[in-house]
């Protein structure tokens, strides 16, 4: 083992189970990196599990989880916070993308700059890297071990998602990882799992989604008044974010006792995960990545689309002013 991997292993005990925890409301990169690290640590004799906070929101991500066929723990199912030693991947409690740590924090592996100094025994934060899966791939390379096709598929799916198929925030490490993984993974399967899929019966509902919206400057919010699936929220958000002069989109399903939401950003100064997490913290829970986030809101605490969007904008401007 080389320096990074050996240092990580030096802070982990084989006498205590390891919990690999993703950022809240995980995406393909978070789960792909977690799965690949699980397989690597297992090869060294560690007992490892994966956990996440929030919800798994999109249809494509559900398909990805089913493909990996790896049990996932929800953080609220963990009662004994002393049972696990925790490695957080693709997120950090020091950035705010992880609200609750599911055990004793040992390590943070991320590709987003933290908002405060890490106190973990091991920290590997590489803000210049496009995907956390690329960092975990580098651990595999350092180990000299061979990964199987499913592990390769998990990592390349993460890179595809976070770099938008190598079209944003790409580093040489991402390219090196992608090149090798391309020939060792099921690329056709990853393409199917990354592209959000919907059912034909959803088309009419999607059409109705554009009749109730509010725009303030480059921010847009849409409310959907029927019981929409999380997949449809993702499809609508993915479409709206590419409207000219729009940089931040929120889609909220306002039906039932708990409202689902999906958010997208294409401005590097507008961190969707942070903005959603902070805005909904007193009315529900949420979070995710800089470019995409999700959440749930208690219907009785929802302040309405105008107040909600204004809260997002006020927080965004205060962050930009720092």
Predicted regions and their residues:
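Fold-independent oxyanion-binding glycine-rich loops
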Residues: 23-24, 68, 89-92, 109-112, ...
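Hydrophobic helix-and-loop "lid/oligomerization" segment in the mid-to-C-terminal part
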Residues: 2-24, 32-62, 82-83, 164-322
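An acidic intrinsically disordered interaction segment
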Residues: 1-8, 95-103, 127-132, 136
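Active-site cofactor/cluster-binding pocket
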Residues: 63-66, 71-122
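Short alpha-helices
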Residues: 111-179
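Short amphipathic alpha-helical face segments that pack within enzyme cores
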Residues: 29-39, 131-138
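Anion (oxyanion) recognition and catalysis
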Residues: 42, 66, 141
């Amino acid at each position: 083992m080389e320096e990074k991997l050996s240092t990580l292993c030096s802070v982990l005990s084989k006498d205590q189970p390891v919990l690999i925890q993703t950022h809240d409301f995980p995406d393909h990169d978070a789960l792909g990196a977690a799965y690949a690290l699980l397989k690597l640590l297992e090869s060294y004799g560690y007992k490892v599990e994966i956990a996440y906070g929030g919800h798994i929101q999109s249809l494509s991500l559900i398909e990805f989880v089913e493909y990996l066929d790896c049990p996932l723990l929800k953080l609220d199912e963990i009662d004994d916070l002393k049972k696990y030693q925790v490695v957080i991947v693709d997120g950090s409690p020091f950035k705010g993308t992880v609200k609750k740590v599911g055990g004793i924090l040992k390590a943070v592996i991320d590709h987003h700059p933290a908002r405060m100094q890490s106190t973990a025994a091991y920290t590997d934060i590489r803000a210049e890297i496009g995907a956390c899966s690329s960092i975990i791939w580098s651990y595999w390379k350092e180990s000299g071990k061979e990964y199987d096709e499913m592990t390769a598929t998990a990592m390349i799916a993460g890179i595809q998602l976070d770099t938008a198929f190598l079209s944003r925030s790409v580093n040489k490490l991402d390219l090196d990882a992608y090149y090798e993984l391309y020939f060792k993974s099921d690329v056709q399967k990853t393409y199917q799992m990354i592209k959000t899929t919907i059912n034909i019966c959803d088309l009419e509902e999607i059409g109705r989604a554009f009749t109730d919206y509010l725009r303030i400057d480059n921010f847009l919010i849409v409310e959907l008044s029927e019981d929409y699936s999380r997949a449809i929220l993702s499809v609508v958000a993915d479409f709206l974010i590419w409207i000219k002069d729009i940089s931040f989109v929120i889609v909220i399903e306002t039906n039932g006792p708990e409202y689902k939401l999906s958010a997208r950003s294409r401005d590097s100064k507008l961190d969707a995960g942070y903005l959603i997490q902070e805005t909904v913290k007193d009315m529900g829970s949420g979070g995710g990545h800089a470019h995409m986030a999700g959440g749930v809101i208690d219907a009785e605490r929802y302040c309405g689309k105008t107040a909600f969007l204004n809260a997002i904008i006020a927080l965004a401007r205060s962050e930009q002013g720092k």
